[in-house]
Amino acid sequence: MNLVIWDIESSSANTDFGSIIEIGGILVDENFKEKDRFNLRCRLPEGEIPQAMALIVNKTSIDQLTKVNLSHYQMLGEVEKKFKKWSPAIFLGWSNIGFDDEMIRKEFFKSIRYPYITNTTPNKRHDGLNIAR
């Protein structure tokens, strides 16, 4: 089964109030040979105020939040297409069960997309932090 290693950067540490502003992923086969990759960045959704500490942590400038061509909705559409294309796979990240999965579920739900794409049949998920523990 293929493995998707993915991560997000967000406008807040709170999954209820923040938005994904950047997401990237790498698709590898069972021998860890890279098959595909993507990295997308979008504008901050209109009316949202980013958390200053989140921007410091993910090294995002105000220009990056406002002058990118891709809208937040368009970015989520591209992510959905990519994840569907890469399925079936095991989705893996670092601390992603506690944060990234929650964030993408909420974002997909708000944009009327299927929110459980990373962990329902035929896909599975795992967390690198849990492996390390």
Identify what each model region corresponds to.
Residues 83, 108-112, 132:
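Short, well-ordered alpha-helical segments in soluble proteins
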Residues 123-133:
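Short alpha-helix plus adjacent loop in nuclease-associated cores
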